[in-house]
Every structure is written in C-alpha cells, then in structure tokens.
Amino acid sequence: MLTIKNWQLLSENDKKLCLSRPRQSSAIKENVLEIINQVQLSGDKALYDLTKQFDRVNLQYLQVPQEKIEQANIPKNALNAITQAIGTISSYHQSLLPENTEISTASGITIRNVYRPIQKVGLYVPGGNKTPLVSSLLMQAIPAKVAGCPIKVLCTPPDAEGEINEHILVAARLCGIDTIYAIGGAQAIAAMAYGTESVIKVDKIFGPGNSYVTQAKTLVAIDADGAAIDMPAGPSEVMILADTEANPEFIAADLLAQAEHGPDSQVILICDECELANQVNQQLEIQMSYLSRIEFIKRSLANSRIIICSNQSEQLDIINSYAPEHLIINRKNPEPWVEKIVAAGTVFLGSWAAETMGDYVTGSNHVLPTSGFARNHSGLSTLDFMTRFTVQAINQEAIRNLGPAAMTLAELEGLDAHANAVQIRLNTLGD
C-alpha cells in the first residue's frame, strides 16, 4: 500500500524526494529522434514500418476510409453518454470564446484584438490499453470545433486488425472530424508535424500520450519546420488534500481512479493524521481486489505516497510546489483554499467532486499540464485553438503627438531607420 511519510520529520532533501515524479529513461529522447528522422526521410513507408514494429500490425491503409467513419455504429447507451458529454463540454468551451475588443491608447490611436481559429490542427488520442479513449477525443475535438478550426485531423493507434474502434469513429463523426489516421506513438506526432504523402502537415498538435508521445511533441515544437504543441502532457497524477472528516472510501476510490491510468501515474494524499492514512490504505486493499487493472495500479502506487502534515501553511506549500495535474480538496470547507492555490491543472472541491466526473462529463477540459508544468501552463481550452493578432490604426494627430517620443526611443537604441520612418511623416505634415 501507500508509504506514509511524516512531513515534519523529513529533511529538506527527503521532502524533495517525497514530491519527485517517476523518472523517464534518458534513452527515450534518442529513440524518438530516430523515429522522427525515419518519418521525415521515408514518409508513409516509415509509418507502415513503424506501425508493424511497435504495434505489430500490417496496416492496409493509413487514412481510415470515409465509408468506415460514416457506417460506424455503437450501442445506444454509449451513444447517449457521448452525446451528453458533448453537450456539457460544448457549453463550457463556448463560454471561453473571446470577443474582439478595441481600445484607444492615445488620441489618434486605436488597437483591436482580433481572434482567428488555427487553420490546421492535429489531434492525438492514445491507444488506451486496447480501450477507446473517447473522452480524450472529445476534449480536443470539441474546442477545435467551437474555435472554428477548418481542418482537423485525428491520429490514433490501430487495433490488432489495423482498425480504429467504432466508438472513436462515431465520436469523431459527431464532432465533425472526417480525416482520421490509424497511426499512434511518436511516429503519429512526427507525421502531423512534418507531413507525409498521406498525412496532412498541421500547424499545432494536441493531446496526451505516453513518454514517447510527450517527447516527440517536445522535439517537434522546438523545430522551426515542425509544429506548435498544446503542452507537455505526460503521465497522469492526482493530489488529494483531506481533513479528518473526509470519507476514506471516497479518497481511496479517487486515488485508484488515477493510478489505473498506467504504471507511471502518481497519486499523493496529504492528510492531518495517521488514523485517516491507515483507513485509506485499508480501503485501497479492499477496492483493488475487484478492479481489473491491478498490475498498473500496484506499479503506480509504488511511485506514490501519503504525507502526514497538520500545518495548513505547509500543506499549501506542498501543493504549490508539486503543482498537481489534478487537485482534490476533500475538506469540509474547501472554497477558501482556492485563492491560495497558485499551481494546479484543475481543482475539485468537496467530497462529492470525484475526479472521474471532470474526466468525462462536467464540461471542463481534462487535457491538463502534468509533471509540474501547471506552474506555467493551463489546461486545454478554446483559446488554445485560436491565434490573436492586433490591428493598429494611427492617424496624423498621433504622429504629431507621439512621433517625437517614438523617434527619441529609436535613437536611444541606435535605430536611425526607425526614427527616419517617423521623421519623414512629420516632414510631410510640415511639423
């Protein structure tokens, strides 16, 4: 079960180790670079070869035929659930649409903010250990649709027969995506970043994935010929802050829900006393016994821990230092804590706020910064699928009033051509 650590008894170095994430292999970067190079050099052929190598599938095609998307069919209960999720996710992301604004900064000057959808976006949906990660698709496709992105392509790994799960096809169809590639892993990221004979080169790539996918996204983002990315979204994680009144059964369930994502997921509980910690560990044993992904969970829990800390100021320091992807404040009065949180992907308030609800149906986006990136990144939103540019209108009055100041600043920086561009206009005005 989870190791219990008393925060007050730890050295500064031990505290850092207590909040450290599982380390990724240094060999991953080299392997991913090789995959990217293969795709750049050999295009479609590399995609077929790499899919055979990693997925052990001989693909019949890279792009899913249109008729397969149109004919895909799923059980009614699944269709209803997807439709309900689309409703809440759409409502939330519609609320994030920005308005074009205009301001006058000085007499004769107006500046407008203009927002436009990114023209070509690539969405990546992981394989999900042979299960269809429909929610990952919805969390990307819906804000892309709301933003108005005209070209939306989807890459997701094929199954053993080289096909895409029909739940994914139906969800994509409902979200207006008709360009789907049966490609996964780092090779999918490379294909969308650079393009191949069959795969469209996109402007920005979205979506979570394993360490290979995350590394590939990072590498293509720093290449001028590659593509922008949403964020480095790696292994999933949750941190729970609980008081003595919290239900240990609920806490254990939330920890396990995150741990089942994969062996490199991490879960951390912060609580006031050992009694609750022991009760949670007992519940973990009970609930694990009937869950299907027990091997994933066991390996994840080995990377995880319970921290005993009764000082609220120190509890906040732990949270903000760790910057969790998901933070659950399972306390009697959680709201006052929010204003003191400075780094978290998303925050769930109260005992009924199961993180599972946020994963699927609240409407908030579940593509969130991990590995501490919540310190400087936000969760995915409609704005991530848009660009903003300014429109500046400057008339003669502004040239007269502010031109001399612009010239002075240009000359201070040794840029006489800049100053000249204003001086010529002042000369024309006769000033």
Swiss-Prot record:
Catalysed conversion reaction: L-histidinol + 2 NAD(+) + H2O = L-histidine + 2 NADH + 3 H(+)
Cofactor note: Binds 1 zinc ion per subunit.
Cofactor: Zn(2+)
Organism listed in the record: Legionella pneumophila subsp. pneumophila (strain Philadelphia 1 / ATCC 33152 / DSM 7513)
Entry similarity comment: Belongs to the histidinol dehydrogenase family.
Transmembrane segments: none
Keyword NAD attached: yes
Annotated keywords: Amino-acid biosynthesis, Histidine biosynthesis, Metal-binding, NAD, Oxidoreductase, Zinc
EC number of the protein: 1.1.1.23
Classification via Pfam families: Histidinol_dh
NAD is among the record's keywords: yes
Residues the record marks as active site: E325 (proton acceptor), H326 (proton acceptor)
Pathway where it operates: Amino-acid biosynthesis; L-histidine biosynthesis; L-histidine from 5-phospho-alpha-D-ribose 1-diphosphate: step 9/9
NCBIfam families xref list: hisD (TIGR00069)
Gene Ontology molecular function terms on file: histidinol dehydrogenase activity; NAD binding; zinc ion binding
Identification of the protein by name: Histidinol dehydrogenase
Binding site for substrate: S236, Q258, H261, H326, D359, E413, H418
